[in-house]
Amino acid sequence: MAGTAVVASGNYDLEIDTGFVQDAFLLDDAVAGLLDNTQYVLDGTTDFASVLDGVNSISVRRGRRDQGDQFSAGTMSFTMLDTAGIFNPFDENSPYYDTAEAQPGLAPMRRVRLSRYSSLNVKEYLFVGVIVNYDYNFALGGLDTVTVFCADDFYLLAQTYLDEFNVSEELSSARVTAVLDLPEVAFPALTRDIATGTQTLGGSAAFVVPQGTNVLGYLSDVNEAEQGRLFMSRDGDLVFDARLGTTLTPSVADFHDDGTNIPYNGVGITFEADQVTNRAVVQILGSNNPQVADDAGSQAKYFVQTYSITTSLLHSDSAALDLAVYLLDPEPEARYTSLATSFALLSSAQRDTVAVIDVGDTITIEKSFTSGVTTTELAQELAVEGIEHTINVNTGHSVTYYTSP
């Protein structure tokens, strides 16, 4: 089995792009110069170095906690024990030091990827992004450690700004593609997964994108008009989903607390007034005519709770009114908001299923409730909005999913 074993969880790999070939045959080298070895080959095959054997903990956060939140950059952090000093950026003898360029191979903005191998030895990515910062901690009289902070490619979009952009009236998905194709953005075409949008965006003078507009901020505005999802997938693709409806995709995993299906060890439940929206106001760019949707019955019970969008990219007042109606959520609903499980509780097949659940997937959560002598079970199918992984080489892998109806 490839990768490094993590207790009661499976085999994993954590790879960092060093900027130079890591497995090339080197003449006269005591390790890389051995004839007929299979690890170091002529010309080499990869710039990525596996560092998991020096890591003691990894934390990944992706997506959002609630459907009403905006998606931000996914993050990963991990801590390495530098017992041999090879992660020291000043060590020119480190195997990760690029002697040809006279610079550390482990450096900010290098590519990084975390993966897990299934029981069939299939490599599945859990996070793909770039390194943002190395925090090296020199411990006098103890072990040096390096904490590495990473972000997915939303971080790159958040650091990029547009030139003035004259837009055309087009579907939201076409606008996303047009922005990503701009020369100042140049987002790779092969790492996009863009569904056809349902909403038309404006193309008049009022919708011209001014110079200096942040790319991620503008794409978030596009998604606000569409009311879909815009996020980076676990394998590094930019995903744009169309407006979310009332029908979910088939469930990819069933979590139960009664000893059947996939077990879990934590569930969040909410039933609160903050869920209510009984007045929605949407105003498009260039219009002085805000579109308002009200639910008088809900306002009588829960007071007026307003959701307002004042600079919508939608093309017409009619579309703005449709969005205002869509945003109404007049009655609070008791629902499961999160679910946590530990891989130590799961079978090998269940671990394979749970590891690859991604934002936008549907899961089923069933919980047993006891009242007196009666036990009832309540199951809900919910969409995954956010994911948190915690991996510790000594205690294993645990995961939390944040959900929406």
Predicted regions and their residues:
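Surface-exposed intrinsically disordered loops and tails
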Residues: 98-103, 198-206, 242-245
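N-terminal export/assembly leaders
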Residues: 158, 176-210
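Low-complexity, flexible helical/coil segments
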Residues: 70-72, 166-171, 183-188, 401-405
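Acidic, small/polar-enriched beta strand-loop surface segments
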Residues: 2-53, 169, 177, 217-394, ...
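Assembly/oligomerization scaffold segments
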Residues: 1-170, 206-227, 232, 260-269, ...
